[in-house]
Each structure stands twice: as structure tokens, then as C-alpha cells.
Amino acid sequence: MIHDAVLDYYGRRLATCSSDRTIKIFEVEGETHRLTETLKGHEGAVWCVAWAHPKYGNILASSGYDGKVFIWREQGGAWQKIFDFALHKASVNIVSWSPHESGCLLACASSDGHVSVLEFKDNSFDHQTFLAHGQGVNSVSWAPSTAPGSIISTNATPAAQRRFVTGGSDNTLKIWSWDAASAQYRCEEGGVLSGHTDWVLDVDWSPTVLQKSYIASASQDRTVRIWTSDSSNPGVWQSRVLKEFDTTVWRVSWSLSGNVLAVSSGDNKVTLWKENLKGEWACVNSLED
């Protein structure tokens, strides 16, 4: 079974991972594709693959049931595993690279309840690991590097923020940000978001940098929630239920512009949602397998 499939920044390479413990790299040209590499090393199913921004080179991260995170790099047409992390005691469910403006940072979410953040610089990695959700972490998503509202602010350009959201088996979302004074990631004040009645399976922070921040969450309680926070009142989050679906909702994903949300549910359907001028969310398309 293939668990993840991700195109690189330019859409020319596709990485997939599966239950057979392998990662496959395909070259994509038009409507054709060609297998160019099979990467091995994980000792269990591989759940997730993620491409780093190309400014850092051809770098791919992978995570799996074996609790390991691998960093792979292509040089001279050959792929090599350059880092092998065993920071977790249970399955690492997802890995996510930060916006490149924030640095070369990789957040890893594990069933052991911890999140690790790896920072790559000068050909070495530093890491921080902290308890996020005691019953397990299922998902993680970075905020845009630019704070909401800042692009229309008259103030000087702020430093890129390091901020992300996690979703856990304790039915909550949590907002984390880098605290320079303590050199640690801390849960923000007002950053524990409650509303779901079952596991939060996926979260996605919208890339929009307008007046509001948007986070979408998918849950085993069969709902998708949209969480919003206005730049004029940071730290205060409000949520509304997008819809109660007939089955578990597995994944949510924003478009690059941040105005369309794709929802994948257990009935083999993908629905696309958009907010109208009244602030109401409506389904604009439905795709069925």
C-alpha cells in the first residue's frame, strides 16, 4: 500500500512511500513517469515523505513505523542517506519542512507523544524534542513565515517566525512557537484548541498571510473544523464545523493561495471548499474515486 506521494517544488520528481518499507523516486515528464531510484533502510512501513525547499539542494525526508527519520540527498545523480535519526520510541507519523525563510527545519510527529524539530545548518543537524500530546501526535503543519497582516503593515520587515500546529490523539490542536529567550518551542497562551470529540488525524495551516490565520483540522469524529485568528487579536482562536461527514475524515489540504480547502474522507471522496463573502464555507466541487 502506498501511504504518501509528493511532488517536488518544480513538479518534476515524485516521491512515494509504502508498506513494503521502500521509497521510490520517479522522474515526471508531461503525462509520463519513470522510476529512477528505490531507497531502502526503514524497518517498517514508511508513512511519509517530504521534499525540502530546493535552495537547500535535492533533499528528501522520510519517516515510518520503525520510529526513525531519514534524510536523503541526491548528489551527482546518486541518492545517499545522510542522516539517520532514532529520536522517537514509536511510529513517526509525519514529517514537515518549515517555510524556507524560517530556515531548514523539519518537524516530526510521533505516536510516543513527542514532537522533534531538526535544524539543518553547516552540514549538521541540531534537534529539540518535547512532549506535545501525551496520547500521541498524528499531524503537524507549519505556519507561514510571515505573520498575518504584516504584508500590509507599515512597520519594518519582521524576522521570519517559527510557528506550527499539531494535532493529537487527545482530541486537541496545539499552537507552538519558538521562544528565543529560552531557546525552546513553547505552546502559546491560548494555543490549546478544543472542539473535536475524537482523535485529530490531520491539520493544515493555510499559507495565506492576510488579516486572518486559518487552520483546518480533520478528525475521527467525522468533522472538519476551520480555526481562525485575527491579527488584531492574536492568541484568540475561533472555530466552526465545516461539515459533519458520513465517515472518518483523513486529510485536509489548502491550495497554494490558501483560499480552497481539499478534504479527503473515508468514503473515497475528495471535496473542495471555499469561503464566500459572508464568511460561510461551501462545497464547490466533489471528486469520487
UniProtKB/Swiss-Prot annotation:
It is a peripheral membrane protein. WD repeats lie at residues 1-36, 41-82, 87-128, 132-186, 195-237, 244-283. This is Protein transport protein SEC13. GO terms for cellular component: COPII vesicle coat; endoplasmic reticulum membrane; GATOR2 complex; nuclear pore outer ring. Component of the coat protein complex II (COPII) which promotes the formation of transport vesicles from the endoplasmic reticulum (ER). The coat has two main functions, the physical deformation of the endoplasmic reticulum membrane into vesicles and the selection of cargo molecules. It also functions as a component of the nuclear pore complex (NPC). NPC components, collectively referred to as nucleoporins (NUPs), can play the role of both NPC structural components and of docking or interaction partners for transiently associated nuclear transport factors. The keyword Repeat applies. Keywords: Cytoplasmic vesicle, Endoplasmic reticulum, ER-Golgi transport, Membrane, mRNA transport, Nuclear pore complex, Nucleus, Protein transport, Repeat, Translocation, Transport, WD repeat. GO terms for biological process: COPII-coated vesicle budding; ERAD pathway; mRNA transport; nuclear pore localization; positive regulation of DNA-templated transcription; positive regulation of ER to Golgi vesicle-mediated transport; positive regulation of protein exit from endoplasmic reticulum; positive regulation of TORC1 signaling. Belongs to the WD repeat SEC13 family. Pfam families: WD40. The COPII coat is composed of at least 5 proteins: the SEC23/24 complex, the SEC13/31 complex, and the protein SAR1. Component of the nuclear pore complex (NPC). NPC constitutes the exclusive means of nucleocytoplasmic transport. NPCs allow the passive diffusion of ions and small molecules and the active, nuclear transport receptor-mediated bidirectional transport of macromolecules such as proteins, RNAs, ribonucleoparticles (RNPs), and ribosomal subunits across the nuclear envelope. Due to its 8-fold rotational symmetry, all subunits are present with 8 copies or multiples thereof. PANTHER family: NUCLEAR PORE COMPLEX PROTEIN SEC13 / SEH1 FAMILY MEMBER, PROTEIN SEC13 HOMOLOG. It comes from Pyricularia oryzae (strain 70-15 / ATCC MYA-4617 / FGSC 8958) (Rice blast fungus). SUPFAM superfamilies: WD40 repeat-like. InterPro entries: G-protein_beta_WD-40_rep (IPR020472), Sec13/Seh1_fam (IPR037363), WD40/YVTN_repeat-like_dom_sf (IPR015943), WD40_repeat_dom_sf (IPR036322), WD40_rpt (IPR001680). GO terms for molecular function: structural molecule activity.
